[in-house]
Amino acid sequence: MDNIEKDIAQGYADFADDEGSIEEVETEENVVTENSTSFSFEETTNFSEMSDINRKLRAYFDGKIVRKDLTKSIKEGANVPVYVLEFLLGQYCSSDDPSIIEEGVANVKRILADNYVRPDEAQKILSLLRQRGSHTVIDKITVNLNIKKDTYEAEFSNLGIKAIPISEDYPSKFDRLLCGGIWCIVQLEYEYIEEDKNASPIHIRKLTPIQMPHVDINELKQGRKAFTKDEWISVMLRSIGMEPDTLKPREKWLLLARMLPLVENNFNLCELGPRSTGKSHLYKEISPNSILVSGGQTTVANLFYNMARKTVGLVGLWDCVAFDEVAGINFKDKDGIQIMKDYMASGSFARGKEEKSASASMVFVGNINQSVDVLLKTSSLFAPFPPEMGTDTAFLDRMHCYIPGWEIPKFRPQHFTNDYGFISDYLAEFIRELRKEQYGDALDKYFRLG
């Protein structure tokens, strides 16, 4: 167990003494059993006879992998992001013993049931904190530096409180707190001081991340050397929930191609195909660094830059902006598509008197409701796009990749893996780290283009 896991394990142990903590409520019988999903841990796959891939994963990435069937069993009743759920499963269920796994799943359910903050229960939790004087919560924490006071302040997403003083040790140790925030287990204390009414009565006693607080990309590269190319492809596909043994080589590469916008800056990708092929799943569920714009209705202010508030839009906040159902893309602003074309070409856009830059990739996914042969005879492969986009060659020329979605099979139960893969958060973070490395000249060794 590396230092990160030791800190987390120690953090969970420290919560045992806190009133309202995780350990305290373990005696309540109804927490785990009531309304919980029944699940058998005697899988048809014999995990005790570990494959070479699983053995290597346990050797080089222990604590960063999870059995994907466990995620499916809990996700149905847990209103938390997949990457948070898998991180907890990776800590409690990193074993091949069915009894240990069953106990670990019960622990994860208990932790979520007792400490996860639902937005509609925020005031109830705050009242409980005031009555008890201390309480433990699971929430997404973002830290900002208050320059005027020269102090760090935390903001709780679901709890709805901000400007909570936090020790500078935490943002120094877990830098992702400063970069969009991470999910944490936090011990809170409440003490109202009459003499200092301006001070916050809420204080952070201890904070323990339940996402990867940071990723060592060199450690990943060293571990990668132990795998063959085909083995690594299998690991990557299982990490996004797919079973490679049910896929043809071409289908594997097409599924991997969906990850390109998450790895490359300013990469424009389009995928059109039949329904039920999981076109938008990767951008919505797997990566916390991408956002799926459903319905297609948006504005220039929301997507690029709000001149009234002087704030950057989605392209400045996310690594990847995906549009679901391209047929419904509609800008309220007349110049919206032109600004989008400028951004897709150069990674920058002009608003007001200045030019702004961003690195978010653009993804367009949609459905084709007829056969490709008929589509080619009657219109084009970009027919699902609105006319002002699908017939504009300047817009189409800015696409770096077109994934033929009709070559990807419709997903059935056998296509989803029950085997080991990377925790979604770990996968997303090392993919994000790879965005900092440039491989644009990698082809020059083998090809000359143009």
Segments (PLM) and residue ranges:
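Conserved ASCE/P-loop NTPase catalytic core
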Residues: 243-374, 379-383, 397
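Conserved NTP-handling cores and scaffolds of large molecular machines
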Residues: 240, 266, 290, 344-348, ...
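N-terminal acidic, proline/glycine-rich, low-complexity intrinsically disordered segments
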Residues: 1-31
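Helical mechanochemical/support elements of P-loop NTPase systems and associated helical scaffolds
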Residues: 228, 232, 332, 336, ...
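Extended, charged/polar low-complexity intrinsically disordered regions
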Residues: 32-239
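Conserved phosphate/pyrophosphate-binding and hydrolysis machinery centered on Walker-type P-loop NTPases
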Residues: 222, 226, 248-252, 417-420, ...
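Phosphate-sensing "switch" segment of ASCE/P-loop ATPases
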Residues: 355-362, 367-450
